[in-house]
Amino acid sequence: MKSVLASGALTLAFSLAALAADAFQASSWDSTHIIRRDVVIVGGGAAGTYAAIRLKDHGKSVVLVERRDRLGGHAVTYKDPNTGGSVDYGVQVYDNNTVVRDFFSRLNTPLADLSFASFGKPVYADFEEGMLLNLTAGTLGQDYINELNKYPYLDNGFELPDPVPEDLLLPWVEYIGKYNIDLSTAIATLARPAVTGNLLNILAIYVFNNLNHLLLHEMSGAVVVNANRDNSQLYRNAVSELQPDLLLRSRVVAGQRRTRKRDGVRLVVDTPTGRKLIIAKQLIVGMPPILDNMRTFGLDSHEHSVLSHIYGLPYYGGVVSDTGLAPGFSFKNYAANTSYNLAEIPSVVAFNPSSVDGLFYYWYNAPQPVSQRRIETEARDAIKTLQRLTNSTTQPEPKFLAFSDFAPYQLRVSAEAIRNGFYDDMYGLQGHRNTWYTGTLFVTGSSQVWNNTEVMLPEILAAVNSS
């Protein structure tokens, strides 16, 4: 039996070797399985979709590769079969700026202004201990603005001075103490939406990069939403626009990227209609460039060394009905007896009202991966606790309607890696081996991702034109 297994393993090894040897030669492929484009884009979230549309607008041919069966990344939407209404339980809002408005207009998707009141009046509760809390929402004060203004280069990425200021590498709780940040301000910085991990231990550099001047602009009320409260509509329209230059449910299984521009890139991609060879002048990586996502791209030793530092954390979201909770309220999980009343993780972050009566969406923060079953069990227990605490007139059994795993979420690297020049090295990879990186490695939020991608386009176009 062992000899049979060994023989099978040897055959597999030879098969993989054969793939590596001639997989990138067009002569080895049926012409119907070869795709030739100016640019191949891998990752169909906010970054990749925007890049594909804008490159088409500039007259370039593209192919977009996405492993899921849809575009949109963290823009996830539940469609209620009873009312036809939509519940966004990932991306919520966009900055009201020209790039955002132009992109929505380009894809014939309506926008509308938003009142933050639609997110519900906050109710603070300790989900674990089962008690309502008399808390006051923090307010960002001038003390935070003064600190943020020290680091203007963090608004649009991480083009850092050398040496990197050591203050930026402090855990946020230590930065708060060192600069005597007011309690109300500190609480506000810890209450920013959809942040993963232990909020006190996040490096200051990531707080300022996330809670930057653009986000402050949004928090002042300068936000827009899809007029139908369906953030996935933008991406459905993008699917229609990009066909047939779109490969959904597809994965890169091998890559060859040369250093000379004229040699371009070649990717072997598994698709629902068979394996394809993509031959392109340039590659844009719009997905999280963590090592596990990039191993099949034929990394050189320098790329491997740089990308190996990147990690993301778990974050989850879902939609639930039959909660028995009062409409128009946002039920937030805090703790009675911890620093800044932060709830321990893993735990549900909040239950928020949606635009569909009776449906709430929730988020769940965890330091390590957690199963959907455990998350929904804990969410169910929290809802039953809230029913009791709020004297709900009905106590139905919650029904879970949708679930999404957003990992790897909010990409980061260690303080030591930053100190040793990680971001200089990462920016140095732009254009290296005809490959470009965009997305949430540099900024958070779709609005900034689109803006940063737009800023990169002239360099990418120049590379295409000179290939």
Curated annotation (Swiss-Prot):
Cofactor: FAD
Signal peptide limits: 1-20
Function: FAD-dependent oxidoreductase; part of the gene cluster that mediates the biosynthesis of the antibiotic 2,4-dihydroxy-3-methyl-6-(2-oxopropyl)benzaldehyde (DHMBA) and its derivatives. The direct non-reducing polyketide synthase dbaI product is 2,4-dihydroxy-3-methyl-6-(2-oxopropyl)benzaldehyde (DHMBA), produced by condensation of one acetyl-CoA starter unit with 4 malonyl-CoA units and one methylation step. The FAD-dependent monooxygenase dbaH is responsible for the synthesis of yellow pigments derived from the oxidation of DHMBA. The roles of dbaB, C, E and F have still to be determined.
Pfam families listed in its UniProt record: NAD_binding_8
Gene that this polypeptide is encoded by: dbaF
Keyword RNA-binding: no
Source organism (scientific name): Emericella nidulans (strain FGSC A4 / ATCC 38163 / CBS 112.46 / NRRL 194 / M139)
Residues modified by glycosylation: 96, 134, 337, 391, 451
Alphabetized UniProt keyword annotations: FAD, Flavoprotein, Glycoprotein, Oxidoreductase, Signal
Identification of the protein by name: FAD-dependent oxidoreductase dbaF
PANTHER family in alphabetical order: FMN REDUCTASE LOT6, PUTATIVE (AFU_ORTHOLOGUE AFUA_7G06600)-RELATED, PROTOPORPHYRINOGEN OXIDASE
Membership in a protein family: Belongs to the beta-cyclopiazonate dehydrogenase family.
GO molecular function: oxidoreductase activity
Organism classification: Eukaryota, Fungi, Dikarya, Ascomycota, Pezizomycotina
Highest taxon in the source lineage: Eukaryota
